[in-house]
Each structure stands twice: as structure tokens, then as C-alpha cells.
Amino acid sequence: MAVPFRRTSKTAKRKRRTHFKLSVPGMVTCPNCGEAKLSHRVCKACGQYKGKEVVSK
């Protein structure tokens, strides 16, 4: 098996990992009830999506 010729420095390792990060979910407020919800998804509090009741509460 191949083995690295030189040890990877802290800087090189950290530069490689700059793109390895978590992304923040797209949160918006529900226009019906004002609760925070994920965009393009049904509101968990009132059950509405795009002004229509999808889930009966």
C-alpha cells in the first residue's frame, strides 16, 4: 500500500477541510400563524402550505 512521503501539515489539512461544513437550514416564518418553519414545507403548527390547509389539526 502507498504511504504519504511527508506528513500533512496543520495548514494544509485545514485548507482542505474549509469546504467540509454544515449549512444552515432555510428557516422562514409562517404567514398564517407566524411560527418558524422550513421553507417549501408544511407548517407543523397550523398545517398549512401556500395558503391551503394540507394537514388538519
Swiss-Prot record:
One Pfam family hit: Ribosomal_L32p
InterPro entries xrefs: Ribosomal_bL32, Ribosomal_bL32_bact, Ribosomal_zn-bd
GO cellular component term of the entry, any: large ribosomal subunit
Recorded superkingdom: Bacteria
Keyword Signal appears in the UniProt entry: no
Keywords, ordered alphabetically: Ribonucleoprotein, Ribosomal protein
Gene Ontology biological process terms from the UniProt entry: translation
Membrane spanning stretches: none
MF term (GO), any: structural constituent of ribosome
PANTHER family per record: 50S RIBOSOMAL PROTEIN L32 (PTHR35534), LARGE RIBOSOMAL SUBUNIT PROTEIN BL32 (PTHR35534:SF2)
HAMAP family: Ribosomal_bL32
Family: Belongs to the bacterial ribosomal protein bL32 family.
Protein name: Large ribosomal subunit protein bL32
